[in-house]
């Protein structure tokens, strides 16, 4: 399936810049270099963890309090997994993949230099993915996320995911 982007909106939001998503339809968060220019290419995602919202919704058995508790537990697990990935990358030497870390595919580090400075400050990202929002809302409310009640719940769920990432 092709990825569709809105070049018109991107140009408006990012000072005329348009950029593609990564292979999994994941976009890097905006990041500017020391001169204030957006940098999209050469950056990377340290890892992604996907939360299965359909499973969270079904596990709650239509109990909203139980749902929010399960969701928070799963989000905590996702955060732990992402931070384990982040910590495991610390200390990685540029020598493990010179084409990436030394010759410019991602950076131009010296031989023997760690990639640590690329792991902080937004140059690279950690991502929380999700799947099954429709099924989650349907299992909790018995209605689609396209109904007024369903839309309200779907937005609250997305806000909770966003809050977990901030």
Language model regions located:
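Contiguous, well-ordered alpha-helical segments that form the cores/surfaces of helical PPI scaffolds
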Residues: 126-139, 159
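Conserved catalytic cores of very large enzyme subunits
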Residues: 1-122, 139, 143-166
